[in-house]
């Protein structure tokens, strides 16, 4: 049995330590800066020059292969100067798409402003009426983003981590400033199982001194105690993470210096005649040499294998002995992820019924308290679950390296005999559905809290789709999988059904449809096709549920509609969108803000996946009122595909002619022909 546990752990560990690179379908919007100090009119010369400049920067002939270009249009006082800088690891095609996307959004985000900076994950676009070329700007327009987590609650460890990051990034800044592309990446060992990754870049038109000064300003402005941070100025960018967020193979490395010439042969004290082929003993001699070489090589390989097994066994002992005090710490390395089963057993009072707080995707969930007072949620795999083993591995592989304030944190896991256990941070307010759909608790969620929940879920999906080093499709986004912390901040949970997409992959097909009926996109539910747009659809359903305070499945014939989407669409087309709003918040919300969110929700649930906005666009719509929203098309109505149900309990499955499916608040684990 111990060998089986070792194998399972090594299998998981091999996934945990592998590196992935995400690719985004659309550029990931970060921020924009457009001070209203100077403006221009629509029909002015400056407006014409600006459009000429933007057209030039986004033309087919722009320098996307180098990732940098500047341009000027017009004459003073209406001259416009602009540039773009693409991240050093992106391809020319990605660079071009990012610049074009940014140009298309420019006049919406910053209308009639004479200078602006637009930050995207893959590029920066900038223009001004001032001369911005060959000039480092470090006094305005910065964008700062930091992970909320620190490496450890121990201050000594935090100080050590901060010092390491500071010295590493400062050294990298000097190397970036000295390079021809003004670019340098970091990939250095932090611990035995954790590397530190970084990327520093300046616009290539800066001098060495200006580039170094700009990057050092970025480093000094970052919260280096966090496990990830970035600070972008209009002229330079600096970022570090504990995962490989860039494509290292796409960044050119300087060629190795040529090998030194071989030393001249030393003169021998005894003259040795040259050996000719005629002096060799023949085939038997060659065979002897070959046999000896093979034997020596085999012995060396055997010794290496024995040494590797010894080290692996020695290291595994450290994995099996995680103590209760270690459990409370932030788990920054893989060796602290596997927890001692007895510690978990004690924390949950031997999985007492009184400690049970719910049921997850593949087992029951318990509240646990470790000896240091740390409260945790413990998910225990059901031994009778067909899909539990696969979902357990998926959840560990996916969640272990994800670090975001809107994703639930995995603190560890345990493999003990048949036991499969996941340990998460504890969420005192349970899940969104517990508050949103409970008539006695709905009053706790005012409009501002609901709006914050919508924005937090969007940020979490953004991270999964585009900002993580993995591209992850959740496939089961629903109210019961959105947990709420003590401050009602949302955290996406339950990744047992998630799929990891490879480089440049945008969609996939499956014959095993998993998820929750009512939240699943039509193309996925009917044909098994899933993509980022499938999660966008689920997000749209969530938005409409949060605004209305009603489940998608809570409608009956008396409502004149059989689901929430039908109801919302009818109200929208009849120009009665505000009738959708939960009466508990109707009097204390901004009508324009609520209607805009309903509009966004309907855009997300459109039947055609191509018409649904990418989550980066959704986030931009939520955070900027200057973005114009397109007219929504009719949503995908699952109701047309649903057969008449037999009278079932609320936790049973409904049956259609072609396959069984579950109702809205229960997850499907398998769909198959009857």
Swiss-Prot record:
Give the UniProt keywords, A-Z.
ATP-binding, Glycoprotein, Kinase, Membrane, Nucleotide-binding, Phosphoprotein, Receptor, Repeat, Serine/threonine-protein kinase, Signal, Transferase, Transmembrane, Transmembrane helix
State the conditions that upregulate or repress this gene: By salicylic acid (SA) or by a bacterial pathogen infection. May be regulated by WRKY DNA-binding proteins at the transcriptional level.
Location in the cell: Membrane
Q: Where are the transmembrane segments?
A: 290-310
Q: Which residues lie on this side of the membrane: Cytoplasmic?
A: 311-674
GO biological process assignments: response to reactive oxygen species
Specify the protein name: Cysteine-rich receptor-like protein kinase 6
The organism named in the record is: Arabidopsis thaliana (Mouse-ear cress)
Source organism phylogeny:
Eukaryota, Viridiplantae, Streptophyta, Embryophyta, Tracheophyta
């Amino acid at each position: 049995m111990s060998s089986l546990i070792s194998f399972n752990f090594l299998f998981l560990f091999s996934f945990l330590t592998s590196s992935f690179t995400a690719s985004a379908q659309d550029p990931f919007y970060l921020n924009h800066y457009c001070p209203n100090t100077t403006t221009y009119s629509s029909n002015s010369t400056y407006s014409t020059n600006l459009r000429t400049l933007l057209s030039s920067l986004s033309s087919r002939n722009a320098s996307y292969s180098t990732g940098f270009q500047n341009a000027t249009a017009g004459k003073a006082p209406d001259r416009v100067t602009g540039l773009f800088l693409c991240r050093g690891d992106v391809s020319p095609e990605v660079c071009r798409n990012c610049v074009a996307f940014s140009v298309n959004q420019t006049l919406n985000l910053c209308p009639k402003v004479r200078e602006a900076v637009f930050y995207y994950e893959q590029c920066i676009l900038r223009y001004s009426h001032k001369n911005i070329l060959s000039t480092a700007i470090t006094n305005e327009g910065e964008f700062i983003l930091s992970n909320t987590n620190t490496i450890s609650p121990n201050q000594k460890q935090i100080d050590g981590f901060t010092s390491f990051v500071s010295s590493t990034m400062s050294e990298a800044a000097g190397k970036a400033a000295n390079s021809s592309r003004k670019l340098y990446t970091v990939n250095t060992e932090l611990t035995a199982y954790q590397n530190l990754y970084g990327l520093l870049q300046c616009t290539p038109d800066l001098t060495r001194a200006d580039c170094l000064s700009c990057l050092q300003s970025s480093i000094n402005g970052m919260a280096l105690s966090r496990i990830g941070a970035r600070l972008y100025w209009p002229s330079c960018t600096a970022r570090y993470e504990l995962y490989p967020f860039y494509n290292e193979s796409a960044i050119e490395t300087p060629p190795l210096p040529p090998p030194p010439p071989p030393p001249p042969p030393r003169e021998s004290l005894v003259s040795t005649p040259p050996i000719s082929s005629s002096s060799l003993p023949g085939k038997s001699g060659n065979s002897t040499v070959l046999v000896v070489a093979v034997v020596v090589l085999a012995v060396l390989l055997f010794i290496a294998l024995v040494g590797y097994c010894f080290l692996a066994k020695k290291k595994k002992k450290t994995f099996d002995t995680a103590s209760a005090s270690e459990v409370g710490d932030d788990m920054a390395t893989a060796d602290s992820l596997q927890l001692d089963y007895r510690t978990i057993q004690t924390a949950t009072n031997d999985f007492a019924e009184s400690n049970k707080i719910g049921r997850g995707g593949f087992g029951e969930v318990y509240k646990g308290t470790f000896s240091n007072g740390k409260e945790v949620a413990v998910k225990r795999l059901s031994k009778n679950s067909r899909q539990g083993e696969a979902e357990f591995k998926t959840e560990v592989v996916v969640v272990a390296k994800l670090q975001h304030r809107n994703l639930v944190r995995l603190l560890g896991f345990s493999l003990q005999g048949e036991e499969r256990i996941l340990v998460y941070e504890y969420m005192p307010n349970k899940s969104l559905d517990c508050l949103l759909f409970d008539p006695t608790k709905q009053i706790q969620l005012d409009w501002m809290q609901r709006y914050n929940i919508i924005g937090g879920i969007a940020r979490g999906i953004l991270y999964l789709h585009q900002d993580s080093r993995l591209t992850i499709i959740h496939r089961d986004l629903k109210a019961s999988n959105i947990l709420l912390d003590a401050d009602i901040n949302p955290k996406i949970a339950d990744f047992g059904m998630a799929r990891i997409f490879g480089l440049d992959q945008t969609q996939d097909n499956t014959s095993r449809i998993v998820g929750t009926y009512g939240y699943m996109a039509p193309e996925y539910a009917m044909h098994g096709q899933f993509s980022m747009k499938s999660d966008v659809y689920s997000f749209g359903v969530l938005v409409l549920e949060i605004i209305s305070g009603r489940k998608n499945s809570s409608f009956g014939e008396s409502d004149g509609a059989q689901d929430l989407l039908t109801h919302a669409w009818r109200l929208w087309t009849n120009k009665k969108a505000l009738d959708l709003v939960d009466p508990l918040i109707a009097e204390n919300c901004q009508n324009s803000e609520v209607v805009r969110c309903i509009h966004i929700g309907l855009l997300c649930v459109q039947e055609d996946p191509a018409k649904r906005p990418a989550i980066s666009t959704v986030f931009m719509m939520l955070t900027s009122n200057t973005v114009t929203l397109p007219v929504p098309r009719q949503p995908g109505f699952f109701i047309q595909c649903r057969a008449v149900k037999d009278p079932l309990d609320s936790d049973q499955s409904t049956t259609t002619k072609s396959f069984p499916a579950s109702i809205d608040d229960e997850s499907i684990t398998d769909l198959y022909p009857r």
